A protein has these predicted regions:
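Outer-membrane beta-barrel "beta-signal"
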Residues: 193-214
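Outer-membrane beta-barrel initiation region
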Residues: 1-38, 49-61
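Membrane-embedded beta-strands of outer-membrane beta-barrel proteins
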Residues: 28-32, 62-64, 95-97, 128-130, ...
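Solvent-exposed loop/turn segments connecting transmembrane beta-strands
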Residues: 19-27, 49-59, 84-93, 116-125, ...
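Outer-membrane beta-barrel channels and translocator barrels
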Residues: 35-41, 69-72, 102-106, 135-139, ...
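Intrinsically disordered, low-complexity segments enriched in Gly and acidic/Ser/Thr residues
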Residues: 115-177
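Transmembrane beta-strand segments that form the barrel wall of outer-membrane beta-barrel proteins
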Residues: 15-19, 30, 40-52, 64-65, ...
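Short helix-loop boundary/capping segments
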Residues: 78-139
């Protein structure tokens, strides 16, 4: 449904009250996407699937992605949005804007805005990140980030400030990846003290071109 790193690294999963590793966040589905170049036109997709849980929750999804490159300034803007209608959970809308620029051959400055609306909660959570990404070698990358997380409900709009380092390593042929993510959280509600979190994660990716099978 969502790459495990995506919501947890932005801090949104904790605001939603979920766990970093939750089987109810898994789904299986198929999506047909246009083959256009995102730097020249919108890449649109339409998909169907089922989200796991009790009960199973079928869904239909529309997605759209676009990229803008500014050659003179080297800035790049990426937009990715998707609208999902679940049978049980209702409407969900997710939007991500990524603005980035290379600093040198190995480092990139990036600003990301992420918004997630869920009809069943009648609220939207968001995060804003400022980060420096560094490519250490062909299999290893490191990111330093400041993340601000919020929600349009509750006592405070801003829920958490996060300082994060994110180490990612390709440990087997671009299929199996290892992540180590230490964080320092500064929550703004509930009189909570700052705390340290450490995430260790393995992710496996299986890719294929189904069109070759027919």
């Amino acid at each position: 449904e969502e790459p495990l790193g995506r919501l947890s690294e932005q801090g949104l999963r904790e605001v939603r009250g979920g766990q970093r590793f939750d089987t109810n966040n898994s789904a299986i589905g198929l999506e047909q996407r246009s083959s256009k170049d995102p730097s020249e036109a919108w890449v649109q997709g339409l998909g169907l699937g089922v989200k796991f849980g009790a009960p199973l929750d079928p869904y239909v999804r529309y997605s759209a992605a676009r990229q803008w490159n500014f050659s003179e300034s080297k800035w790049q803007i990426n937009s990715l949005s998707r609208v999902t209608q679940f049978n049980q959970r209702g409407l969900q809308v997710r939007t991500n804007f990524d603005v980035n620029r290379p600093i040198d051959e190995d480092r990139t400055l990036r600003f990301q805005t992420y918004v997630d609306f869920e009809e069943r909660r009648d609220s939207a959570v968001f995060s804003q990140t400022a980060e420096i990404n560094r490519v250490i070698d062909s299999r290893t990358a490191l990111r330093y980030a400041l993340i601000v997380v919020g929600e349009d409900r509750g006592e405070n709009t801003i829920k958490d400030y996060v300082l994060q380092a994110y180490y990612r390593r390709d440990i087997h042929k671009n299929i199996l990846f290892m992540d180590i993510v230490p964080e320092i959280h500064f929550p703004t509600e509930g009189n909570l003290d700052p705390y340290v979190a450490l995430t260790f994660r393995l992710e496996a990716f299986f890719r294929g071109n189904f069109s070759r099978l027919f």
